[in-house]
Amino acid sequence: MTNSVLRVVEHLRERAHDVLIVAPGAGPDSYRGAPVVRIPALDVPGVGSLPIGVPTRTVLTALAGFRPDVVHLASPFVVGARGLAAARRLRVPSIAVYQTDIAGFAAAYGFGLATRAAWRWVRRLHSRADRTLAPSTDSVEQLRLHGIPRVHRWARGVDIERFSPSHADQALRSELAPNGELLVGFVGRLAPEKEVGRLTALAGVDGIRVVVVGDGPELASLRERLPGAAFLGAKYGDELSAAYASLDVFVHTGPHETFCQAVQEAMASGLPVLAPDAGGPKDLVLPGRTGYLLPADRAGFADALVSKVNDLRDDALRARLGEKARKVVLGRTWPAVCSELVGHYEAVQGRIARAA
């Protein structure tokens, strides 16, 4: 289950709402008092770190027994399609949350011919939901351009206590930058769609230490391409908080983000952010105020990355951008965002969409 789904469940349970979760793969059979119905999961060839659920009649059976007022479909693609069909059969309103740029994902994994097919499938699914929620202005526009109706924007929250400059670890900084290097970091899954290899533009730049936090299928390749970088592996909880807050600059490299929670967590941690001028980061980064948006193409990104990182050697500039970055996200708490989601639930009550 994704972090956003867990935060939604927590919000609903704290307010005494009944919740049933249907999730792929092995795991606990409950979360915060909400039962979890488990369905089988399979690895996608070439994308082993992202297993997908196998649709079964269990979805319909579970929903029929639970009798929900609304069905929340988190990033529907395979299992979500079965959930949507079950909701329509039971005449229960549904909300589909668009979280993954499926077409961009397909292209990143070399499935270029599947891009159009992916959009056809996305359109078919989301057109049958009573409301689609997309996390950024860019993703809302993309969905509407592809003919998907009833699209609304619903962003993501951030835990401003978990992610804060106060979690900086001076011992970690000393270990990573023994000679006072500028620590430029990436946090996320090391996979083709993230294009972490763009950080090679910084390889060999004097006074710069690249820090990579995460794991995934590209790890071995990235170690070869970034021999001087520090690879910290996947971090969670307090270690993740410390990793963010101990950096000087945060860089996100992938151009296919529908939102980009890592950017928001970095901002909450008081870091200036460099990210492609594409997708979700366009809503999050205020150029010249909280960081900079760089050209989305690889060559342009590489040139701008080196230039902006060199600019950010200036302590005063980093401090100003980082302070503003945190201020910008202080109002984006999970309770506020989840209350907005409940408003969407209420808006679809009694409405069953027709297939477009």
Briefly describe each language-model feature range.
Residues 287-288, 292-300, 308-315:
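Conserved acidic donor-binding segment of nucleotide-sugar-dependent glycosyltransferases
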Residues 177-207, 211:
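Conserved donor-binding/catalytic core segment of Leloir-type glycosyltransferases
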Residues 1-40, 334-339, 346, 353:
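N-terminal subdomain of nucleotide-sugar transferases
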Residues 272-275, 285:
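Short hydrophobic beta-strand element within catalytic cores of glycosyltransferases
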Residues 63, 126, 234-235, 242-247:
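Short alpha-helical donor nucleotide-sugar binding micro-motif in glycosyltransferases
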Residues 23, 119-169, 178-179, 232:
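Donor nucleotide-sugar binding/catalytic pocket of nucleotide-sugar-dependent glycosyltransferases
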Residues 255:
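Aromatic "clamp/platform" in nucleotide-sugar-dependent glycosyltransferases that forms part
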Residues 220-238:
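Nucleotide-activated donor-binding/catalytic signature segment of Leloir-type glycosyltransferases, i.e.
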